Curated annotation (Swiss-Prot):
PROSITE patterns per the UniProt record, alphabetical: RIBOSOMAL_S9
Biased composition, class Basic and acidic residues, residue ranges: 105-117
Gene3D superfamilies: 3.30.230.10
Alphabetical UniProt keywords: Ribonucleoprotein, Ribosomal protein
Entry's family note: Belongs to the universal ribosomal protein uS9 family.
InterPro entries: Ribosomal_Su5_D2-typ_SF, Ribosomal_uS9, Ribosomal_uS9_bac/plastid, Ribosomal_uS9_CS, Ribsml_uS5_D2-typ_fold_subgr
Taxonomic superkingdom: Bacteria
GO molecular function: RNA binding; structural constituent of ribosome
Bilayer-crossing regions: none
Stretches with biased composition (Basic residues): 118-137
One GO location term (cellular component): cytosolic small ribosomal subunit
Protein name: Small ribosomal subunit protein uS9
GO biological process terms on file: translation
């Protein structure tokens, strides 16, 4: 989450996590393009409007959706976890941009890590909580 300078452009970094997904997000002044793992964002997210809305939410909260290009490297999990990880990473990068951005992003919940993850399987059970059928006699 450091800001660095490359070729006279300032880059803002943020890392987001959700379930088993980890996203490293870079914000670069630009036109609002989203690139995920080298592919256009809408292609990577299968044109799913819910995923696209989640990725764009932090920028739209601050009214900066056309001001910054979003470059993402994401791995692990599925598209739902990856989209929410990108959302959190973008929000953290926007906090690096300006300290004033933190409060509206916090109110909208974009900075909060969602702790829900798959519960581990316990021995003696078929799944995390599903028990084998009980027979009284």
């Amino acid at each position: 989450m450091n800001s660095s300078s490359q070729r006279n452009t300032v880059v803002y970094w943020g890392t987001g996590r959700r379930k088993t997904s980890v996203a490293r997000v870079r914000l670069i002044p630009g036109t609002g393009k989203i690139t995920i793992n080298g592919r256009p964002g809408d292609h990577y997210l299968n044109f799913n409007p819910a995923y696209l809305a989640a990725v764009k939410a932090p920028l739209q909260t601050l009214g900066l959706s056309d001001s910054y290009d979003v470059l993402v490297n994401v791995y692990g999990g599925g598209l739902t976890g990856q989209a929410d990880a990108i959302k959190q990473g973008a929000a953290r990068a926007l906090c690096e941009l300006s300290a004033d951005n933190r409060k509206p992003l916090k109110i909208e919940g974009h900075l909060s890590r969602d702790p829900r993850a798959k519960e581990r399987r316990k021995y003696g059970l078929k799944k995390a909580r599903k028990a084998p059928q009980f027979s009284k006699r």
